[in-house]
């Protein structure tokens, strides 16, 4: 079962890397703009995606000027990263709408599932699909288990952080 999980997770990482390459570049540019202009990068992780906020705030290779989102502190030079399991998360959509009304550049990170009337994708400037729609490992009873959404989000975050650091280094 461990080998299946490892293989499936590698596939998720590959899909994120190839399908979302343009979105990573756009999102990294937005974050680099905040770093270069002494703005703040605000992070908001919903439920298990709080792992991304923890990594951004306390990880070994933090981006500069990162804070947990306080919507009342956000200014136009700042950028916001909202991370949720699925693009249909109501809390993520509500926050993204507020930020859009304030003309704040916002990046969303979530798995895109069946389109409904509104999704996070509709209210952010750049969206990175986490490409994880169902559990990865088939169980003996025909169901599936193993839904590592936070692992996919951490991979996407680290990819984004590396690209952002590269852009900032080129600027300096």
PLM features per residue range, with description:
Residues 17-21, 83-86:
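Short, flexible loop segments at the rims of nucleotide/cofactor-binding pockets, characterized by
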Residues 5-7, 21-24, 72-74, 89:
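Long, low-complexity, intrinsically disordered N-terminal extensions of eukaryotic proteins, enriched
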Residues 39-40, 46-165:
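Glycine-rich phosphate-binding loops that contact phosphosugars or nucleotide phosphates
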Residues 19-36:
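A short, well-structured juxtamembrane/interface segment
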Residues 1, 23-26, 48, 152:
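Short, contiguous, pocket-lining structural segments
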